[in-house]
C-alpha cells in the first residue's frame, strides 16, 4: 500500500483501489491495471503525483488523483515483478526475475514523464537496461546524484555461489565497478547511512555487508559478517547499529530465527532478538 493524502492506495487483482485511511470506506473510483501479479509482495510506489504498480513482467503508472492510467512498461524478457519500485530524480528503478532459469533478466531505469497525455496505455521504453542471469529477486537499488548501487542473484540462484554487487552510471546504466558477495544472492534493498558514509545490504547466503564507495562510484572496501542464517532483509540503520532479519533452522515456531543487531563500530553482532518465525521480508 501507499499513503496518498487521506487515502490508502492498494492493488486487488487487476484493479488499483483506494480507501479512506480514517474510515476504511473504499472509494468508488477504481484504476484498471494492465495485468496481475502471480506473486504480489511489493507495494505500489507513490512519487511525483503518480502511483507506480507492478504486474507480471511490467510496470504501470497512474495519476495519483484520478487513478487513471498514464503509461505502461512491458519488459521484453518478462518475469516476476518482485523487486521494489524505487523512485529517484524523475526516474523509477526496478527489476524482473525468471527465477533459476538462467535467462538474462533485466533491471530497468524508466523516465516517469508522461510523453503522451492523451493516451492511457502509452507503451514506455526504458532509459537504460542492465542484465543479469537469474535476475533480481526482491533486490532494490539506491541512487546517488551520479551512480546507482544494486545487488542481484547469482547465475544459479543458490545460497552458496557469489553474486555481484555493482555500481552503475546513473545516466547510461553502464557498469562502473563490481564486487562480489561471500555467497548467495542479494535480496535486500541497498541502505545508505550518512553518519558512516557507507552502504549496507544482506545476502541469502547468510551475510551482512558494509560497502564504502568513492565519489566516482568505485568500491574502496567491502566488509562482511556471518549472521548464522539466511537474510533477505533490508538493513535499518540507526544510531550506529543495523537491524536485519535472520533465518533459523526451520519453519516451525522459535527455531532460531531472529532480528540481528549489528554494532557498526566493532562490526560485530551485539545481540539477537529471537522471533517466532523467519523475518523474511525485504523491507
Language model segments and positions:
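Sequence-structural signature of mature extracellular/luminal beta-sheet repeat domains
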Residues: 15, 116-117
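Kelch-like beta-propeller repeat domains
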Residues: 162, 175-180, 185, 206-212, ...
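Short loop/turn segments that connect beta-strands within beta-propeller blades
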Residues: 20-24, 63-67, 111-115, 168-173, ...
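Ankyrin-repeat and related helical/solenoid repeat scaffolds used for protein-protein interactions
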Residues: 260, 265-275, 280-283
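Repeat-blade elements of multi-bladed beta-propeller folds
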Residues: 1-15, 35-59, 80-108, 133-165, ...
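Hydrophobic residues in beta-strands and at strand termini
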Residues: 18-19, 32, 61, 75, ...
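A short beta-strand motif characteristic of beta-propeller blades
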Residues: 25-35, 68-74, 118-131, 174-180, ...
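Glycine-rich phosphate/oxyanion-binding loops and their immediately adjacent helices
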Residues: 202, 220-221, 245-246, 262-265, ...
Amino acid at each position: 500500500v501507499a499513503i496518498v493524502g487521506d487515502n490508502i492506495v492498494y492493488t486487488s487483482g487487476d484493479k488499483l483501489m483506494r480507501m479512506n485511511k480514517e474510515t476504511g470506506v473504499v472509494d468508488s473510483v477504481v484504476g484498471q491495471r494492465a495485468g496481475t501479479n502471480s506473486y504480489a509482495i511489493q507495494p505500489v510506489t507513490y512519487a511525483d503525483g503518480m502511483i507506480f504498480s507492478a504486474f507480471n513482467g511490467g510496470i504501470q503508472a497512474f495519476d495519483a488523483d484520478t487513478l487513471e492510467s498514464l503509461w505502461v512498461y512491458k519488459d521484453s524478457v518478462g518475469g516476476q515483478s518482485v523487486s521494489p519500485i524505487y523512485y529517484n530524480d524523475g526516474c523509477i528503478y526496478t527489476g524482473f526475475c525468471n527465477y533459476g532459469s538462467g535467462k538474462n533478466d533485466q533491471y530497468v531505469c524508466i523516465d516517469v514523464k508522461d510523453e503522451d497525455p492523451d493516451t492511457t496505455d502509452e507503451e514506455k521504453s526504458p532509459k537504460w537496461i542492465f542484465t543479469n542471469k537469474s535476475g533480481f529477486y526482491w533486490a532494490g537499488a539506491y541512487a546517488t546524484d551520479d551512480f546507482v548501487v544494486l545487488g542481484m542473484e547469482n547465475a544459479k540462484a543458490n545460497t552458496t555461489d557469489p553474486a555481484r554487487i555493482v555500481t552503475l552510471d546513473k545516466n547510461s546504466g553502464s557498469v562502473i565497478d563490481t564486487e562480489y558477495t561471500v555467497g548467495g544472492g542479494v535480496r535486500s534493498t541497498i541502505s545508505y547511512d550518512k553518519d558512516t558514509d557507507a552502504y549496507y545490504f544482506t545476502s541469502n547466503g547468510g551475510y551482512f555487508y558494509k560497502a564504502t564507495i568513492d565519489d566516482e562510484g568505485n568500491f574502496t572496501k567491502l566488509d562482511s559478517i556471518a549472521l548464522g542464517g539466511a537474510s533477505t532483509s533490508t538493513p535499518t540503520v540507526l544510531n550506529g547499529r543495523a537491524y536485519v532479519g535472520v533465518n533459523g533452522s526451520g519453519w516451525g515456531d522459535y527455531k532460531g530465527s531472529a532480528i540481528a543487531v549489528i554494532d557498526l563500530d566493532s562490526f560485530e553482532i551485539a545481540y539477537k532478538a529471537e522471533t517466532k518465525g523467519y523475518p523474511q521480508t525485504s523491507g
